[in-house]
From Swiss-Prot:
InterPro entries given in the database record: Ribosomal_eL30, Ribosomal_eL30-like, Ribosomal_eL30-like_sf, Ribosomal_eL30_CS, Ribosomal_eL8/eL30/eS12/Gad45
Annotated PANTHER family: RIBOSOMAL PROTEIN L30
UniProt xrefs under Gene3D superfamilies: 3.30.1330.30
Gene Ontology BP terms: translation
Gene: rpl30e
One GO cellular component term noted in the UniProt record for this chain: cytosolic large ribosomal subunit
Source organism: Saccharolobus solfataricus (strain ATCC 35092 / DSM 1617 / JCM 11322 / P2)
NCBIfam families: PRK01018.1
Official protein name in the record: Large ribosomal subunit protein eL30
Amino acid sequence: MIKVSEQQVSFEGELKSLLKTGKVIFGAKRAIKYIKLSKVKMVIVASTLRGDLKQDIMHYAKLSNIPVYEYKGSGWDLGTLCGKPFMISTISIIDEGDSKILDIIKER
């Protein structure tokens, strides 16, 4: 039996709510572009994101005072969680919609 923490369940539920009611952008290169324009509220990166891209995202997010959350799973895990048949390395949150994902992540 796989143990799933309560925090993980709430994160996954809020991520699904975010995808239904909010506005997000997938992809590291697009994330960097939108971070530079300060049009992002938060960025979620997969733990397996390539090092140079992760450093760029962290650097520009720090300059723009945008929080970055590192998802513990791989890009494939994040893609599956988002209901996509492909890997997702980065999710940029433009509008959180009805989800409380920003609050949940800030609590961590």
